[in-house]
């Protein structure tokens, strides 16, 4: 009985202490208990970084701060536990609470939305930084007196002042690095914009279509919550109102729009995946007409199969991309809410598999009988049709458009003024003279570094003596994006801790690319060489240099592999892997390569298979963590050739891919940048196994003619495969123009008025037009060989002159730049009967008889290829 009273007294004391510490952040008791359980599991997983990450939560924080911190740590991705400390997350939590108290809309936001769409720092797979505090300080006074909807629009204008669109590589820069660069791809723009909105207590989430159905690309944008509902905006692309963007029409053709939600979210949206750390939701119905389709998985006798893995796949980039991976229930059923296009549905269990195309327009259920086994060789052709094109269906007044356009131009000037603070060539040449460096080479690196130029100048100035010979090789080894955000400390760490070869010290190129280079794949660059060199003793490092297999064994025995915890796909840094002793397979592979390089052993991820490799005894050696290692003699030579009837040279991830069968599904090999595939025939050395070659010919309306060839690679037998692109139907005339009306509106010179013309109505500052320009730049030589006559049409002299002075220099030599009398962008669509709208660019090919041969409106990837195929 006495023990019972002591227990009651203890509960009362804890309760009174809780009251003194303030109100709960997690107000629902059952939810709070679930967070505590998850926090305990995460703390156990991250036990090797308890002091750095978790200890602060037990330091007597105010109750709401403690619960908020436990919530964040409980559901964080593994990389965040490995590479960031608890005080980093606590400072962001305090900034979030301060923002909630600052703005009038803070008290109107439901707790659940604040918890999942304001509090988390991470948006996607970016490097995390202190942007929340920086952005809040800059935005607070600017938006404090606005309504929530007005504040959203104003924040997006601020984002446009800082950042505009330009394509970059797949690694996602941090928000502050994107601001420093002043441009980013859509994934970086949307990550930055979500970070800015959350910094001022506006619930925001990055949403994206992982692959378009009608075009070989994807797109990311932002949803914001205001007035009791979710709205969308184009990141760094301000419109006068919410729910208006250039991608409104393309999104109506999407097959999936989704977003990952941090934590145990209880919202009403359609759930694609429920993980213990996050939820993936399907929000396609916010943008397009949808339909739920079903897969019924059966065995060879027709009985339902439980727990079969099922993927709903979409053709894009010459592969079948899994929009959703799920599992059949006890009735053999699973489902997916999607758009009205075509998909490939693939099911597998216990080595058996089945697949079938589904036309969502006409079907709602596909039966998949698991009767196929790996090894059967055959070829089949399929046509995959995207959802039908539809108009955007929104409009804003001309006065609002003009006011917004004027403001956008002003914001462009603000951004340009910032860009003029970057180092110029005169300063670069003076620095080169002082340091006795090649001025043109130094200027190249400084020009590419943009707002990060000080890191490069400081690095150049800190090198001396014979080591300076390795300055440019190090800067050449990292990517262009690395130049824009690599810290000075990373450059110095690699420079000071690399084992430089002497005059006869082996292959210098190998050293530059695979020892000196800090970049392994898409990881966050932190100093790691000095860190790892201190952690491993000299005897071990010496043994690794004579036998890199010693490091392989150390990694196998020391690093625990967790396949699920790093759901953000942001790799752990090498230092983070060492400290945590837990990693996902990809981060483990990066760690192995980085550790090899730190010890003077050349290492890399093999470009096609992405397997870690080390260079030893003049050969590359695969590292098969947990897999059977193949010798070079066991590999099979595959020769690829292009069919002579192909009307273009096939390009990897555009016209074809190679896929290897693995655990019931085919997965693409990554040969995108491999120079061997630059000409045909070419040879690849591959592991024996079951393979699929996918080729695709995307037609002008987005339909794909796909060819699937299943084949085996057998040890000791060379194999040849021919890349065959299916022929498109005969070219159709889409409509016929009255050429007199065309000439009356557009001042086309008489000398070319009877020839084939490419007309392009332009909006140079918008992302769809920039994609079109990038297509033309990539196909410039081919267009010139075709003697293509391109006429770019602009609204005004400023747009025209700015374009000519910038990108115009990279356009085909026969291009003309004109201002039509009316800028009637609906002239061509109206003639063809296609849906018209206000989205640019409008690109058309007209022959000398006024017949419209080709038409593209708005966002479209591959216009350059389309035009080349259409020109005669």
Set out the residue ranges of the language-model regions:
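Hydrophobic/aromatic-rich core segments of domains that either
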Residues: 23-27, 40, 141-146, 151-157, ...
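Secondary-structure boundary elements
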Residues: 27-181, 217, 400-580, 626-627
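Short Pro-Gly-centered beta-turn/loop motif in secreted/extracellular proteins
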Residues: 227, 330-344, 349-352, 358-365, ...
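A short, amphipathic beta-strand motif
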Residues: 291-302, 332, 634-648
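Short, acidic Ser/Thr/Gly-rich low-complexity loop/linker segments typical of extracellular
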Residues: 316-337, 662-680
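Short active-site neighborhood of thiol/selenol oxidoreductases, capturing the structured segment around
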Residues: 747-776, 789-793
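Short, internal strand/loop/helix patches
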Residues: 805-840
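A short, hydrophobic beta-strand/beta-hairpin element that forms part of a small beta-sheet core
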Residues: 838-858
